[in-house]
Amino acid sequence: MLEIEALYVPLSKLRNIGIMAHIDAGKTTTTERILYYTGRKHVLGSVDEGTATMDWMEQEKERGITIKAAATTCFWKEHRINIIDTPGHVDFTVEVERALRVLDGAVAVFDATAGVEPQSETVWRQAERYSVPRIAFMNKMDKTGADFFMSIKSMVEKLHAKPVAIQVPIGAEKDFIGVVDLIEMKAITWTSEDGSEFIKHEIPENMLDLAEEMREEMISMLAEEDEELLELYLEEQELPVEKIKDILRKATINNKLVPVLCGAAARNKGIQPLLDAVVDYLPSPIDIPAVKAITPSGEEIQIPPSVEGDFAGLAFKIQTDPYVGKLAYVRVYSGKLEKGSYVYNSTKQIRERVARLIFMHADKREDAEYARAGDIVAIIGLKNTTTGDTLCSQERPVLLEKMSFPEPVISIAIEPLTRDDEERMVKAVAALSEEDPTLRINVDRETGQVVLSGMGELHLEIVTDRLKREFGVNVRVGRPQVSYRETIRQTGTAEGKYVRQTGGRGQYGHVIMKFEPLPLDGEKQFEFINKTVGGVIPREYIPAIEEGVKEAMEMGVLAGYPMIGVRAVLLDGSYHEVDSSEIAFKVAASLAFKNAMKICQPVLLEPVMKLEVVVPEEYVGGIIADLNARRAQIESLESRINLRVIKAFVPLSELFGYATTLRSLSQGRAVHVAQFSHYKEAPDKVVEKVLKVV
């Protein structure tokens, strides 16, 4: 148990960090070693043996992968470090997204034999979007094919990052024994089996030239960030270690540089210097820009991290716990929150009671009396709070920026086996969809089937497994189906008029709207613009018109799939002093949309996946031939040590069952990763097939 009072360190000594990477790069093992060396646990956990503290779900232990982002707290050199270990599998990217939204810094773990891999790119882009400062850890330096310098080069080429090596490895592969610290110019080698003991000593003679060359490169990069250091560097004066660290810290926090370290977490080497780097170079809550918020009057304000300020926090994750019910994970940005107090949910405009406050250690709970600015805490008692909601004081309500999540690309139908299962299933799928914003639940109006939509086959497999294990629901699972989308090719203008006169107050709504195609690769998939002038439609009805279009777009006119890539422009309309209402304008907008679709040329879109296959040379020909038969667009063929890497774009509909085919084509020696890339117009044959089913 942690002493709860010890948790409350000064904000400057707090680090909220995420551990992120491609699947199998060693994130969870790195986190397990961090917990061991900081004294948070006393036995070395193993992902392969299912004993990792941070992988606590049964499915995680069985599969040796991280599915949910797990949170924990540890201490290092008088600093408190809150860590979230995130999944590396693309199907669980939502866990990375919401973790990065509330963290101040991150450790990006790379497999030193592979460098930057597909999901490394995805999580890096997510971190870029939230401007999260990062340090890089080149893991698995003890593996055959490990190459520290190749891995750094891949960061430049694939991530367009500016990595700066602050260590170089001593030895490689089976001969990896330690690192050279380029800032202090000392060698560090590990002397005990569990990695808890190490010695600092002079740099080996055979490494001096390389160390001096790499230090020169490091100082040169730092000198670009600081004039005073540049002068000392040009005058060839001795550079103080603290000065170097200070400049590197500023450059890291400003996202100008990425410090790079190395080690072998599974062999217990390199973790203590990594912890030093977390403390030395990643930001505390007071080092990052104040979070932006909107007041009820629409004014944009900034909320600085202060314990004395008004309470403000973001619920970034909901979890159903079998013992305590619903847990809301909250990042506290300002003020203090006490157990038993009330909190205002400004997103839903309701007041809720904080029954308990808990600091989480994976699935273990430690009760707390209060939480302060900078904390990541789990709250019990918030019955109506969902992911992305703002929590604040009712006296000074604010609204933080909402969270956005990717659309699901694959669906399955599920049916309960018995009447008892049916009753339990309704509650279970509701609880799971509340936890996971990328899991969508729809009921087919014609068949009554429940359709689950998610990010990939593994995602939906885990969901159905959880239905059975955690909720005791037995279901029959249908074959996976592609989640198609629809869009428009042409611009079209149409009128929508809704008039009802049936005794008493009537209904009147009238709009003229233009609908234009938006680029499918752009940030926005829907845009609404009001171009009316002179009050032809009162302002209070405009949101209802936008809502009417959005609702109409949920079921496309071609095959009933949701529509994307549409700009709706309100041009004109009219209203009635007595009969007009929000409902009437909502209906009028949906009528205008349906009328415009007759001239906008709606088309069907299919999801396209970015596929990477790593395979021995002798199987490349057969695999490329198979991909071509699957309508793949081969992007590149690269070499990686003694393997080939095939990169391609393939329609999702062509990838069902691909793992089995690939195993057969490569005698089990190939591995593949697929992640959603974009939507593109489906060919006629696919359209015909889809329309037959509808």
UniProtKB/Swiss-Prot annotation:
GTP binds at residues 21-28, 85-89, 139-142. One of its GO terms (biological process) is ribosome disassembly. Catalyzes the GTP-dependent ribosomal translocation step during translation elongation. During this step, the ribosome changes from the pre-translocational (PRE) to the post-translocational (POST) state as the newly formed A-site-bound peptidyl-tRNA and P-site-bound deacylated tRNA move to the P and E sites, respectively. Catalyzes the coordinated movement of the two tRNA molecules, the mRNA and conformational changes in the ribosome. Transmembrane segments: none annotated. It is found in: Cytoplasm. InterPro entries: EF-G-like_DII, EFG_II, EFG_III, EFG_III/V, EFG_IV, EFG_V, EFG_V-like, G_TR_CS. The keyword DNA-binding does not apply. It holds the Pfam family EFG_III. Belongs to the TRAFAC class translation factor GTPase superfamily. Classic translation factor GTPase family. EF-G/EF-2 subfamily. Its main location: cytoplasm. PANTHER family: RIBOSOME-RELEASING FACTOR 2, MITOCHONDRIAL (PTHR43261:SF1), TRANSLATION ELONGATION FACTOR G-RELATED (PTHR43261). GO terms for cellular component: cytoplasm. The gene is fusA. Residues 12-286 form the tr-type G domain. CDD domains: EF-G (cd01886), EFG_III (cd16262), EFG_mtEFG1_IV (cd01434), EFG_mtEFG_C (cd03713), EFG_mtEFG_II (cd04088). It comes from the Bacteria. The lineage of its organism: Bacteria, Thermotogati, Thermotogota, Thermotogae, Thermotogales. SUPFAM superfamilies: EF-G C-terminal domain-like, P-loop containing nucleoside triphosphate hydrolases, Ribosomal protein S5 domain 2-like, Translation proteins. It comes from Pseudothermotoga lettingae (strain ATCC BAA-301 / DSM 14385 / NBRC 107922 / TMO) (Thermotoga lettingae). One of its GO terms (molecular function) is GTPase activity. Keywords: Cytoplasm, Elongation factor, GTP-binding, Nucleotide-binding, Protein biosynthesis. This is Elongation factor G.
